[in-house]
Design a protein with these regions (language model features):
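S-adenosyl-L-methionine
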Residues: 1-113, 117-183, ...
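Conserved acidic-Pro-Pro-aromatic motif
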Residues: 81, 101-108, 184-283
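Short, glycine/charged-enriched secondary-structure capping and boundary segments
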Residues: 97-101, 121-124, 147-150, 162, ...
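Short internal loop-to-helix segment that lines adenine-nucleotide cofactor pockets
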Residues: 55-84, 132, 161-220, 231-235
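Short N-terminal helix/helix-N-cap motif within the alpha/beta-hydrolase-1
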Residues: 92-95, 117, 143, 207-211
Length: 283
């Protein structure tokens, strides 16, 4: 192990060791409720989610702030819309939304059974009656599909699409291939369940998720915060632009550039007026 890498990215280096893989299966990594600075405790696995515990207030700070401002703006306007968390993982953004706006309804979509266990425990323990957990992947069709489960960090599980999973590419650890259910977001967009804000973090499956959300996006024009990397990024931008969305780099709040991988997208006819969007971007 390189000493420079150990000191510059210690957790990344430690995760590559056999000892860490052993400890993940030990009682040190049993599910527990932790205080992450929200209004209620959150279920995590201490070692699997070590980066969340150690870097919680510094984890995706620009995206977190943008998301929080958008959620609060929707709440202030008393917008009758929900938050759809697509690729919820252990629930970080769902819990931020619930902590900031307890009356807002949330649907958390997550296919990984180990993450689903955490989501359900948090909801049950804290009696989060506004949160609905849907144990499925979102895509552009119905049925079962193969899913690379990331048992090391739980954060980079992905639909099998021929690409090398992150945990294998960067940490040298094998993912576990499991079968999960998939469906389309349009199936959950009903008169009783209309999203005002959608967060999408699905490790390369964004084009398919958006295709399966096309009717909802056309009809209701929710605000979108999503992660995407080349070459999928161009597909995502083209798809949203054709629907009339405005798009900025979510981290920099500037036009898209060479380093863009997080998008903030809104429609001029969406749930918030342009003045509120500008206020969010200038905050």
């Amino acid at each position: 192990m390189s000493l420079s890498l150990l000191f510059n990215a210690p957790l990344h280096s430690i995760r590559k060791t056999r000892l860490y893989a052993f400890l993940l299966k030990s009682r040190l990594n049993r599910v527990r409720l932790s205080n992450l600075g929200l209004s209620f405790p959150v279920a995590i696995r201490p070692l699997t989610h070590a980066s969340i515990r150690w870097r919680n207030n510094r984890l995706e700070p620009e995206i977190t702030e943008l998301f929080t401002q958008a959620i609060k703006a929707l709440d202030r306007k008393d917008i009758d819309g929900q938050f759809f968390d697509v690729g919820a993982n252990h629930g970080r953004y769902a819990w931020i939304a619930q902590s900031a706006c307890p009356d807002m309804k949330v649907i958390a979509f997550e296919p990984d059974p180990e993450n689903i266990e955490l989501l359900e425990l948090t909801v049950e323990h804290s009696k989060l009656e506004q949160v609905r957990i849907v144990a499925t992947a979102l895509s552009d069709e119905e049925g079962m599909i193969s899913f690379h489960q990331d048992k090391l960090t739980s954060a980079t599980g992905m639909i099998q699409d021929g690409e090398t999973p992150w945990v294998e590419k960067y940490l040298g650890q094998k993912s576990r291939l499991i079968e999960v259910r998939r469906t389309m977001l349009d199936s959950y967009c009903t008169p009783e369940s209309i999203p005002a804000l959608i967060k999408i973090d699905v490790e390369g499956h964004e084009p398919e998720v958006l295709q399966g959300s096309a009717q909802c996006l056309q009809d209701h024009k929710p605000i979108l915060i999503l992660e995407s990397f080349p070459p999928k990024l161009e597909q995502v931008v083209n798809f949203l632009t054709e629907l009339g969305y405005e798009i900025l780099d979510a981290e920099r709040k500037k036009p898209l550039g060479a380093h863009t991988n997080n998008l903030f997208a809104w429609h001029p006819e969406g749930p918030l007026p342009e003045s509120d969007i500008r206020e969010i971007l200038e905050s």
